[in-house]
Amino acid sequence: MESLLENPVRAVLYLKELTAIVQNQQSLIHTQRERIDELERRLDELSAENRSLWEHQQLLQAQPPPGLVPPSSAPLPAAPATAPAAAARAQEPLQDQGQRSAAAPHPAPDRPPRQHHGQLLEQPQRGPGSRAHTPQSPHKHLGTQGAVTDKEKERPPSCCAAAGALLQHKSPSALGKGVLSRRPENETVLHQFCCPAADACSDLASQSDGSCTQAGGGMEDSVVAAAAVAAGRPSAHAPKAQAQELQEEEERPGAGAASPRAGPQHKASPGRQQPALATALCPHAPAASDYELSLDLKNKQIEMLEHKYGGHLVSRRAACTIQTAFRQYQLSKNFEKIRNSLLESRLPRRISLRKVRSPTAESLAAEKALMEGYGLVGLPLVRSPSLPPTFAGTLTELEDSFTEQVQSLAKSIDDALSTWSLKTMCSLRESGAYQLHQALQAAAGPPGLEAEGRAPESAGPGPGDDAAETPGLPPAHSGTLMMAFRDVTVQIANQNISVSSSTALSVANCLGAQTVQAPAEPAAGKAEQGETSGREAPEAPAVGREDASAEDSCAEAAASGAADGATAPKTEEEEEEEETAEVGRGAEAEAGDLEQLSSSSTSTKSAKSGSEASASASKDALQAMILSLPRYHCENPASCKSPTLSTDTLRKRLYRIGLNLFNINPDKGIQFLISRGFIPDTPIGVAHFLLQRKGLSRQMIGEFLGNSKKQFNRDVLDCVVDEMDFSSMELDEALRKFQAHIRVQGEAQKVERLIEAFSQRYCMCNPEVVQQFHNPDTIFILAFAIILLNTDMYSPNIKPDRKMMLEDFIRNLRGVDDGADIPRELVVGIYERIQQKELKSNEDHVTYVTKVEKSIVGMKTVLSVPHRRLVCCSRLFEVTDVNKLQKQAAHQREVFLFNDLLVILKLCPKKKSSSTYTFCKSVGLLGMQFQLFENEYYSHGITLVTPLSGSEKKQVLHFCALGSDEMQKFVEDLKESIAEVTELEQIRIEWELEKQQGTKTLSFKPCGAQGDPQSKQGSPTAKREAALRERPAESTVEVSIHNRLQTSQHNSGLGAERGAPVPPPDLQPSPPRQQTPPLPPPPPTPPGTLVQCQQIVKVIVLDKPCLARMEPLLSQALSCYTSSSSDSCGSTPLGGPGSPVKVTHQPPLPPPPPPYNHPHQFCPPGSLLHGHRYSSGSRSLV
């Protein structure tokens, strides 16, 4: 046998490189912090200077010349006459003292100047050329100082006009930081300090009685015209965005204050109400209740809106036209603002180029040692193709290179360790000490218990050990305590401690005292595909997954399981078949974070080798890497529950429910999928899921990634663009590749965020292209212009004579490159390529639904929504009377089954219509019941009963099929779709109840039972929890590791025959709980106990000397929680003392897995020795 230490040495070398990368990133962060401190210092100086100017101006206003003070009874229109003189005299003391000439506004000859505190903050940064722009800063007269000051005192502090009063309450540092941290799309800081929202500003300004100037009333047309210039054509859609024009008018650098007549227009404009028709609920309107309506109620609400606005066709056409025009107008307006800001050099730097790293002595020494290590093992350096080939050249800001290098290193570590452990397992298999068991069928007993017994059995026997154990039972003295974390598995053996991924097979004490664990497929993907039914073993779900992964690693029995599990019940539609098959095939992508960061960085082995010093040095890097991994933060921990799934069918159903939730609300869908363990809770894992999984709407992917309010979404977007390689591609072709995965449309802010991230990545991949421009932000402007061009060119609402021409496109990009023009041949090439081929996203499941919808005549229900998926299409025959024989050809129906809807169509004659189908009726699946029937007339019949919305009546439909196979296939798909939509509705109701009632305290739940069974009766989860509540609660021990680890409850008591639960002792008639003797503490926890956890905060790696000292502490820590856990379980008020316990006879169900933020519980291994087999072949702990 070859040397087994060769590949671990490679892993150590890879970890050294990983540590060096982390150190480089830390040094870069330190440098950036120093720069930030320097910027803050300069900002404080600038704020202090502005403060002194403002105080001096206030002093001048407090003591004006006597001739300039008008009488208090003077009318307000007389103010403009004296305002220029007042402003001119106010400037003289400033110029005499040597202050900047731009500190005070220069009066215009024809109108009074207006002053705002935002103008004072920006003036020190402007050059001499700012004189022309300074008088146009809106909002306030400086004339009639006394009258204006009285007006300011009467106004509330939230009004825009109270700029001077607000400045008195703000420190200079706060004012300066507000300017620095403003959003890029805000060109001025008019509303940074005084207005919470633009609507409030406009409303208050419109209600004012003359304090706000009317000089800006004529700016409305200029705002619309400026936005139309960005699109390269006259202002066609200006009336549709009139309300937003008035709302955002004050934010433009040259716009005046809102006129008093703008108030009624702002309130009565239909432009604010019509877009709500397409979305059913206006996102900006203050909602009276946060309760989320169900899908049928939302559809009913849209139907009522359509009826209110003139019917289905008229209202929908108007809503689509208005929404499209308004979004295009907003994009054009944003582009105009960004372009003007760039021309005036006021746009903050968006695209940051990587900088060359200066080599230090430490970095050179580390690189040299790493080079020697690679030469020792004969491996080439792993480098990203987008990075320069020189080793000491340009390791830079690590915004993209850090991720790429970590991925490559993680893959190399996994390969090295899996190769080594494969040799070890094969050698053990040859010696007869290790056996593999093929995955059984769904009806047979799960291999979880047997696999669990085989894993310690193969790990336990070393030289001279006795391996004769009863099959299916774990050995009594295996000497291990395994904690299967969500991302990391820590195995504490008698002689060492090893850390590896949670989806690894432990082969402990192999070849002496070495501990080896083989990384394999992540558990999430295995459970989705259903290649193994190890999830059915409630006592050890992690071990069952590990053994299934071991079977794959040795390539023995995974083929049959993959063939059985990869086929979903819904195979009529190709998209659905690919979706369910991909669930198991792409497991690496679904848990890519585990493979690339978590599992690779936690693969440190404390093996007997000559490289113990290097291994110990990498332990610190391992711990730091684990702690520094960004995680998804669950906003509602009560909804982040992870129930155990006993069957593959239920697992697949929950996965589809997660996809539906994502297509309805992306944030909730990601939260659901993470809590159920389908995807990792790290940005890179979610990024792989979004890029490589089918069943996700491209539109909703863009909605999720464009949400800049949440840091996690921004991190996922960065990881998504890092996965794309735009090297040696034209900008429009790279944008085409980006938009193929993500649909870039919707709100202007989200589109801008997506384009910004794309531009950043493009600059990283093509530094030679960026060098052709004066400013890297030109790439961002050009990409934004390409999106506008594509929208304008292919929008059906724009007439051909109004579409953007080549000269318009060139004129829009004139002078954006720091005053220089983009080369004409580059712009012409982009325009011609966009004209030849549209930028559009790849097909998704909505594409097939849209094709079906276009082929239907008379369809009132909107089919093409992001969450709707076509399941199957069957040809059935409608039966009007089941007791009469009828001609089947006269009632032939094409039944399209969607995941939430059943659409019944009939074929159209080809001569009369170009369409394929005529709409008959559509019924929802929620609440639907079906029953098969057979009589002398119809041998394969089915009856559908659907409740009518808003009524207690029910609709009954009868169908029959020609053959039993077709009917059986339709019934299976229908049954699964009804269960899916019912479970989805139950989950929605549970979330809403938790949101309305607040987060439920888990301490009031009986011994780890999750949720309130009364709120979800009838669901599979409720049945499991009902059985769990009546199980014995004795011999449970609570373990808390940093208050973040979680586990499932393992019960040790024996149940009655056929799963009849035994009532807990505290529920039987007994004296009060105060008089019951306390439960004795259990003995120290023996080894061989499995504890499943959900999340890990800190990993402590111990060597042999430390282990001897830690074992008594560990046993003491486990035993100290016995009384408190038993007391909490016994004191739960399940029923009054002496109340009878209702015993129900039902098959045992596995306990739910750990929820987040729940006490860590496990049971000593004695309870795992009693497995009872039932007639169904399944095993249970009861």
From Swiss-Prot:
Residue spans of biased composition, Basic and acidic residues class? 533-548, 1022-1033
Select a single GO molecular function from the record's annotations and give it.
guanyl-nucleotide exchange factor activity
**Subunit composition and interactions:** Interacts with DLG1 and DLG4. Interacts with GPHN.
Q: What InterPro entries does UniProt report for this protein, alphabetically?
A: IQSEC_PH, PH-like_dom_sf, Sec7_C_sf, Sec7_dom, Sec7_dom_sf
What family does this belong to? Belongs to the BRAG family.
Q: Per its UniProt record, what PROSITE patterns does this chain match? A: IQ, SEC7
The Pro residues compositionally biased stretches are 63-78, 1061-1087, 1147-1157
Q: What are its GO cellular component terms? A: cytosol; GABA-ergic synapse; glycinergic synapse; inhibitory synapse; nucleoplasm; postsynaptic density; postsynaptic membrane; postsynaptic specialization of symmetric synapse
Task: Please list the GO biological process terms of this entry.
Answer: actin cytoskeleton organization; regulation of ARF protein signal transduction
Which residue windows does the record flag with biased composition (Low complexity)? 79-105, 254-263, 555-569, 598-616, 1121-1132
Q: Where is the IQ domain?
A: 315-344
Q: Does the keyword Coiled coil apply?
A: yes
Purpose of the protein: Acts as a guanine nucleotide exchange factor (GEF) for ARF1.
Q: Where is the PH domain?
A: 850-983
Subcellular location per UniProt equals: Cytoplasm; Postsynaptic density
Alphabetically sorted, this entry's keywords are: Coiled coil, Cytoplasm, Phosphoprotein, Synapse
Q: In which tissues is it expressed?
A: Expressed specifically in the adult brain, predominantly in the cerebral cortex and the olfactory bulb, but not in the fetal brain. Expressed only in mature neurons, but not in undifferentiated neural stem precursor cells (NSPCs), nor in glioma cells.
Coiled-coil blocks:
20-56, 964-992
This protein's name: IQ motif and SEC7 domain-containing protein 3
Where along the chain is composition biased (Acidic residues)?
A: 572-581
Q: Does the keyword Membrane apply?
A: no
Which residues are modified to Phosphoserine? S259
Organism, by scientific name, is Homo sapiens
Q: Which ranges carry the SEC7 domain?
A: 644-837
Region of interest: Disordered: 62-157, 230-275, 444-479, 521-616, 1002-1090, 1121-1182
Q: Where is the composition biased (Polar residues)?
A: 1043-1052
